[in-house]
């Protein structure tokens, strides 16, 4: 057989077939020289003398001649069956054992020869009743070692000073017995000397590990060696992913811990509530029995849980003056027997107003409405200021354009529906209007235009006339007809194309809006306020114009005397008639 391990047989590998008579007879001595038996040990150890002798003897069938020397087996005299009787009983729960080996084996510190010498000397100096035992001595020494390891974990590297006894005494807790603390000061001096002698290294024997990056394969006392594994390539993404996983795990554990704490708090509150209810029930039972013994006839309202009455809300002024309906009162018990029910009132929160100082809903709504109107007026004033020097031809301008006045030259001829004055007008008014014809040039327009005529109507579609005086005092009247449409000669075929062309389409999307939306309601409020302001301004302007007309009429009557009736045009002038004076 070869030294190499045979490969695995596959269906594709060709294997030669050898007959029995085709095998060459090989000498046994030559065959024995070859390594036909796998030793099972490392290659470096196959040259060991006793191993080679044992392999050769096994190959030749002479097993008794050579063997590997091993130590003889020594039987122990300890009787484990007597020391550890088989009385173990399997527990019923799934948790078989929860203690660690360190908890079961006791104190891990073992006394040495130096400790034994110091232990005997210390006990000889003390009385027999005040001597320390070996277990107590080991417990104190282990406490010193554990405290030094906790406070100085790198003492063997940094070589710091040994911990003082005051620091050791501060670290003593309930784990150290009171009977042992009195020996701690004497034992500390011995422990300190041993610690200084070892270079402030731990006194307890510990396993030796590999220290540093270089591995020492020749040191037989190294307990655990590092595995020679190729280091995984680390990237920032893997580091961030690992940190996220740890952060998520910590959050989940913290949430679970908080949930458990909240569940515990809830169950404790439930337990306390149940205990209180049970106590209340027992006390109510005692009260009931006491009432029966004393023959007290009363209702059982104090034996049941009463509902907490809420504070009644304040009624508005509209319902404050209404008489309250009288309620039927139950039969009252005697004052001596009726228990006084506790009055439950909600404490008033700091910073809140009392019920008497609360504002009414009408006041709040009025204040909000005034604030909205104030904002609207401010916005209108801002728009008027912005539009100074410009003419706003929008559909509904916030700042209305100036009122259009008739030109001094041309005046529109308006057809009046009532050519004769109404019956309610007196003859004095007629005489007054006739007198104004010669005094004021505007009186002619006042006779043709009714008093309800608005100055801001479009006069471009009304024919207008102009009176002027020519040479020799001749009176001339110029006429201006209505503006005709602009006629553009267009091909009838092209005009027919636009016959049914409209700007609007039936396929336009309709936008649905909520009429009670805040923005729409605010827009309607703004429009209504603007209309009210415009109506008020128009009424004020109309009143001022009427007052000015009356004042001018009075001044004219005073200066010119009685009116001249001869200049009137008759009682029924035709539509579009113009008065002329010579």
From Swiss-Prot:
Belongs to the enhancer of polycomb family. The keyword DNA damage applies. Residues 323-351, 539-582 are annotated as: Disordered. It is found in: Nucleus. The keyword Signal does not apply. Its main location: nucleus. Keywords: Cell cycle, Coiled coil, DNA damage, DNA repair, Nucleus, Transcription, Transcription regulation. The lineage of its organism: Eukaryota, Fungi, Dikarya, Ascomycota, Pezizomycotina. Residues 539-555 have a biased composition (Low complexity). It comes from Aspergillus fumigatus (strain ATCC MYA-4609 / CBS 101355 / FGSC A1100 / Af293). InterPro entries: Enhancer_polycomb, Enhancer_polycomb-like_N. This is Enhancer of polycomb-like protein 1. It comes from the Eukaryota. Component of the NuA4 histone acetyltransferase complex which is involved in transcriptional activation of selected genes principally by acetylation of nucleosomal histone H4 and H2A. The NuA4 complex is also involved in DNA repair. Involved in gene silencing by neighboring heterochromatin, blockage of the silencing spreading along the chromosome, and required for cell cycle progression through G2/M. GO terms for biological process: DNA repair; regulation of transcription by RNA polymerase II. GO terms for cellular component: NuA4 histone acetyltransferase complex; nucleus; piccolo histone acetyltransferase complex. Component of the NuA4 histone acetyltransferase complex. Pfam families: EPL1. Residues 238-295, 352-385 form a coiled coil.
